[in-house]
Amino acid sequence: MNEVTILDDPDLLTSQTLIHKAAAALFRKDLLVARELYTEVLSHTPYNILAYVDRSKTHLELGYPDLAAGDAYRALLLGDAIRETLQGRTLIPGSVDRKVNDGDEGWAIGEQAFITTYSHIRLLSERALGEEHIKKLLKIAVDGMEASALFTLARSLKEARCFMDALTYCKMGLTRYPDASALPQEINFQAETDMIHQLMEQKKEEDPRFKLNPNILFRHGGCRREVYPWNHHEPDRYNAKTVASLNAKMAESSGKVEIRVVNLPILQKRQDPLNKLELSDKVSGSEKQLGVYAKEDIYVGETFFREMSPLTVLSDPEYSRLCEFCAADLGEDYETCEDCWEGDEESGIMWCSVECKKNAIEKYHPALCARDFGWVYRAINASISTSSAHSLLLLKTYATAITLDTHPLELPEVKYLYGVNRVPFYPDYTPSTLERQALPFNFTNQVTRPIQMLQEMDVDIFQPNAVDFFDLWVIQTLWAKFIGVASARVHERTGRTEIAAVHMLYSMFNHSCDPNITWECGGEVNFTGFSRKCGRTSEFNNGVVAVKKGEECFSHYCDISLDYSDRQEHAWGPLGGRCSCSRCLEEEAEVAAELMSDLSIKSK
């Protein structure tokens, strides 16, 4: 690209105009408009550091620190790519001696980011610039944008309560920019560091658990869990046509149940710092959901529902004796992929049948074939948290979307999964100190690792279609869906997740801590009639009805043998708030009565 091309390039010219409009919208606090304009800039110039930095600030003001962190991190990646590209090369784009390496994706990204940054500098200049002048201006521009990105990233992680990661980027800022006077007044890494330490000490005083394991707990924060205002992929799940379509699918899995639109209580989002029961600030009202109802009696021990899912993952498919597609036990005869198989009888991707291999290759395997994801599996298996499997569900969703060239949120396996409700958008939203953010947030799991997984599949995350497909809000929407509906099977010996899966129809069953059905996880999920009085049994009992005709079928999203407070903690993630089933309300009243009795005794 030479000087003439830069000055005439329609995308660059449009991008420049949009940036000015977006900045004006941001200044007047028209935040959704500003976000839309910055996103449009990225569709014209997808390697634009400035657009990522400013959209990051916009997300932070909108009350989405998680999305702000994602944009700021991508801006830093572009800045690093530019620096690497500039090493040992002439600066003016299009120079004949410029070294080009088409096989180096990192260099290609740096080249595109360099051209975009150089072009904006050139468009702002009234005359052609010499190389030394360009070098000086580029350094000033890149340094300024990187400093802003680092500071916004640290602030965003602080707001999301990922304090350890926030400190990491504050330290990076202090190292890169030791002279604070050379930075804009609003960028102060030392002041931000001091504030983070103060918040950490405050949290330790509020919750003693943070004193015991601060390095882990201070990396896990939270963020808003909602349908983003710009998310146009979420279907109207309560439309009569949608419900009819889902019931047609349900008929393939069970003839004894049907999906209906129901009203469920709005869940309480507040709690005290120690996770104890609050007796005030209750919420009331109801909201629409889907539920599953019995069309005829279902008996204890009767398996009445079966559903397969291609979104089934193994914690270590290369060393498992389970089918990578359906999670069934492998027999003596199994199928492999020659491109993945290394000749070691103890490793490699394996399927239990020709049919499973065919399905895998048609749906997702080409994007994963012969790729090295060992680092992902090692990280997953190092954790005992069942949420670690969500990274693997993301990976398979990405692979399916890439293979089928379909937006991740439009995949049939994902589209109708319940993750969040569409709530009214409040531009002046600020999270309450008592409000537990309903979507857990971890910077590694939800920002850096997904980017690394996409890069392993040769996805340039800055390409226009990648911005739309794999922007962080898409990842967060998927994460919310997986937290809400994913099932998992834990290995009896290690206590770690062995299998996880998401099933569309399974997700339609609502939760109760006093369920009338129970399930078994695998590539195929089975529902069986259940009663806490009878306990778990595989024997069909014709004499005991678990669910009467016309009643709602209630599954369970947590271990129902736990006590009230532990169940509330475990169910919070899937439900997005306090469980308010009949059992919990009854036990909550008992806890409240005990508390009032204790207070009465102390007052005497």
Locate predicted features.
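Short alpha-helical interaction motifs and adjacent low-complexity tails used for partner binding
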Residues: M1-K604
